[in-house]
């Protein structure tokens, strides 16, 4: 018993940190949507795989279809990317989804994700919406994604000092 007590006391002096990593896939594949990367408009490629330090993230809590034409609550952890990542000349095309909805044929909407590193945790989520007022160093997350990264939830408001990297999913 004394050994166990001493062991616990010794462990309490050791620095401990825990980290987690989660990667969420897009709701649909290009095969399911019939969108083609080769025919899509492109404004995001110049930003891919370039970490942005000192970034911030916020959250939104509304449903519906986002700027890509996809349901913004599917998957439940997702992101709205900066309006500067979207090509204003991108065309809306009919998809192969069962409801034949129109989708934005823009690379930012086709298997593109944002990876956020914050307080030792890493979350990678698909971009399925646009945050017009956000700069490239600001990502607007679904509430569930925000809460996964920031345990303080909505009381934090704007989470700061994140590293943001736009990547292929």
Predicted regions: what they are:
Residues 1-20:
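Cleavable N-terminal signal peptides of Sec/SRP-targeted secreted and luminal proteins
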Residues 16-169:
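Secreted/periplasmic proteins
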